[in-house]
């Protein structure tokens, strides 16, 4: 038959929220780079509220910087230089940049750990009940998890609440 070889999945109707198909949708798993959906969502909400400006310079700290030899996906902003928020946001969404994610997390939260707390607060607001964030990138870390169902809720929130920035995702 046409049985999909997928472990965890969900398909929802965006307009109604109706679940059309699902498989282990509430089962938590390590979300890897899907984590960056929440990182970018928080940045977008701060831009829309005026708390951040698109042209605001963000420092690429030594902690956030990709050394080039790493296995991570990066946008490769040189260490100790700056890039505007809008470029960092595009680097997170398009290139899955861990460096941009960490630099933005440090800028907004003061540290990546504090930013993860903000991510968890936002997850609660959206109704993500099987999700817990430990970092802004999705790098493997004990206790860092999400479910397909929760990520669908986050995708809905991005489409609904970040209309201005949503085209970057396509």
Task: Label each residue range with its predicted role.
Residues 161-170:
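Conserved active-site loop region of the serine DD-peptidase/beta-lactamase
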Residues 2-3, 7-149, 156-160:
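Active-site-adjacent loops and short helices of periplasmic peptidoglycan-processing enzymes
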């Amino acid at each position: 038959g046409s049985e999909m070889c997928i472990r965890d999945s969900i398909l929802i109707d965006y307009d109604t929220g109706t679940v059309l198909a699902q498989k282990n949708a509430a089962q938590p798993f390590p979300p890897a780079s899907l984590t960056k959906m929440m990182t970018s969502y928080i940045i977008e909400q701060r831009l829309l509220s005026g708390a951040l400006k698109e042209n605001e310079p963000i420092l690429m700290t030594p902690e956030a910087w990709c050394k080039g030899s790493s296995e991570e996906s990066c946008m490769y902003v040189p260490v100790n230089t700056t890039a505007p928020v809008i470029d960092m946001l595009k680097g997170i969404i398009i290139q899955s940049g861990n460096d941009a994610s960490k630099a933005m997390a440090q800028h907004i939260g003061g540290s990546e750990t504090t930013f993860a707390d903000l991510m968890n607060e936002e997850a609660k607001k959206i109704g993500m009940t099987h999700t817990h964030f430990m970092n802004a990138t999705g790098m493997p870390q004990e206790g860092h998890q999400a479910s397909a169902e929760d990520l669908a809720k986050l995708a809905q929130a991005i489409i609904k609440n970040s209309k201005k920035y949503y085209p970057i995702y396509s």
